[in-house]
């Protein structure tokens, strides 16, 4: 989801917009939703999307509010619609017109207080009246579709987001239309809940993280650098969300005591792992779920938020993760272990023997051609020693399809010291890989990986002496872009990473081992 690039719009520029959209493509995004709570972007935005092949989901500029349709206001809106439809309609990147952001849903439920999994007990945000409902129907289900049909008949009109097709017909039905899924995050459910849903299309979902330390330093004095300080909480769009980040963090990682920088790093891993958990699940179920748009791409000021790129253009861990989990050909793993246990804190004799541990690999292919790949996996311990070699299998995945491999039971795996490494190769080149734990990261017994690196030209070579999870490689200004970052590394492996932009000065690294 694309939001305004700056709170002061004249500070944006075509060059800045191009860079942002190029970075979206670099992370394998193929669609950008122009959010209805922002503004209609400049012509330059659409020109760049045409050039880069990005499909635009274009909201009309209405979000999260009711509008009273006086004759004068309706006349003003009609002029606005005519102007923007005529301006945008000729762009090859335009894929969809959407009437508004979340207004059908809010009207249907009578405000946030009455939405599912938001039992606040507060009164609705507004009292629905027949006139308000009539105004909604007239604007989004009569005026707008009629105007789009007259001025841009070849482009599809969708009445709202989320929606099941309009007419207040259960706009959040996961079996039809699109869904904004916020039970994870706003509803405080664990991110493992993503696997309980197979939506048709997820047009908005997200998970917050703090920006990097250099960005925090841009709006704080040293005495403000505590996430519960006045300044840090005011640089937070979502009320009390710094506390929410810490609640989720405590469910997943150990408490970071090594300083604010480590806490910020941990929050970014939390966000990235949560989104990976959801997207990979939906990609494995291609055919049922046909798309996911991450909330959000960018920020309009330096802030803790759902973005994958912060205000200054620094990539968070999520953006690097997106590059991997949105890759055209993806190998992913549906594991069973501690997170799948319906009662992981139950009294039992031995958690290792009483918990089912298994993996089931899946290759998803978003290209227009069949893809033949070789899949390999190993069960390894925290020293990267191979405990069980899964061998290799060659499979062909049809175009725009997925292929499941057989489930493998791993009763011998120690959930506190073992992990599975899996990789996908094509023509001898590794094109997708990751690792999976059977416990939450805070319970895994990491060994100091003794990370080291050297620079050769425009490349960095990173190595480890033990299994390293989510290796972060930053320069002094924390502003470079690498070909890969926040990756898993096995002992003895050398990871060669190209420097896309930025200087290799003051390189520092860490992994989940350092969250302590």
Predicted segment positions?
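Hydrophobic faces of well-ordered beta-strands that scaffold small-molecule active sites
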Residues: 1, 32-34, 56-58, 99, ...
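Active-site neighborhood of glycoside hydrolase catalytic domains
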Residues: 51, 67-166, 270, 312-313
């Amino acid at each position: 989801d694309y939001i305004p690039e700056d709170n002061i719009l004249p500070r944006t520029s075509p060059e800045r917009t191009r860079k942002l959209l190029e970075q979206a493509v670099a992370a394998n995004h193929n669609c950008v939703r122009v959010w209805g709570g922002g503004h209609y972007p400049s012509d330059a935005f659409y020109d760049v999307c045409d050039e880069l092949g990005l499909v635009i989901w274009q909201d009309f500029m209405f979000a999260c509010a009711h509008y009273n349709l006086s004759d004068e206001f309706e006349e003003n809106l009609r002029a606005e619609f005519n102007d923007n439809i005529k301006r945008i309609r000729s762009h090859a990147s335009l894929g969809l017109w959407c009437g508004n952001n979340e207004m059908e849903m809010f009207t249907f439920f009578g405000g946030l207080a009455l939405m599912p999994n938001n039992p606040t007990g507060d009164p609705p945000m507004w009292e629905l009246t027949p006139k308000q409902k009539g105004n909604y129907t007239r604007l989004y289900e009569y005026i707008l579709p009629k105007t789009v049909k007259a001025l841009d008949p070849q482009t599809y009109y969708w009445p709202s987001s989320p929606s099941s097709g309009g007419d207040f017909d259960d706009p959040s039905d996961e079996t039809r239309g699109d869904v904004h899924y916020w039970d994870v995050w706003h509803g405080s459910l664990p991110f493992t809940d993503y696997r309980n849903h197979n939506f048709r299309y997820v047009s908005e979902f997200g998970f917050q993280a703090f920006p990097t330390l250099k960005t925090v330093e841009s709006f704080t004095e040293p005495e403000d650098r505590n996430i519960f300080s006045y300044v840090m909480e005011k640089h937070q769009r979502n009320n009390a969300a710094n506390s929410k980040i810490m609640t989720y963090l405590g469910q997943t990682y150990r408490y970071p005591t090594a300083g604010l920088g480590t806490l910020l790093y941990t929050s970014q891993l939390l966000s990235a792992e949560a989104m990976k958990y959801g997207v990979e699940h939906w990609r494995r179920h291609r055919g049922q779920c046909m798309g996911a748009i991450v909330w959000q791409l960018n920020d309009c000021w330096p802030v803790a938020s759902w973005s994958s790129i912060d205000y200054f253009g620094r990539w968070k861990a999520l953006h690097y993760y997106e590059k991997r989990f949105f890759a055209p050909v993806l190998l992913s793993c549906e594991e069973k272990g501690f997170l799948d246990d319906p009662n992981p804190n139950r009294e039992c004799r031995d958690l290792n023997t009483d918990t089912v541990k298994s993996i089931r690999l899946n290759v998803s292919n978003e290209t227009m051609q069949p893809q033949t790949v070789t899949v390999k996996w190993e069960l390894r311990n925290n020293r990267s020693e191979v405990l069980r070699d899964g061998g290799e299998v060659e499979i062909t995945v049809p175009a725009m399809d997925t292929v499941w491999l057989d489930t493998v039971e791993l009763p011998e795996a120690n959930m506190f010291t073992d992990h599975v490494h899996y990789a996908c190769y094509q023509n001898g080149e590794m094109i997708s890989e990751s690792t999976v734990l059977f416990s939450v990261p805070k319970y895994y017994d990491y060994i100091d990986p003794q990370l080291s690196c050297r620079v050769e030209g425009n490349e960095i070579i990173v190595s480890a002496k033990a299994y390293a999870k989510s290796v972060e490689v930053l320069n002094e200004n924390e502003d470079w872009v690498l070909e890969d970052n926040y990756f898993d590394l096995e002992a003895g492996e050398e990871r060669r990473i190209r420097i896309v932009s930025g200087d290799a000065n003051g390189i520092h690294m860490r992994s989940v081992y350092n969250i302590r």
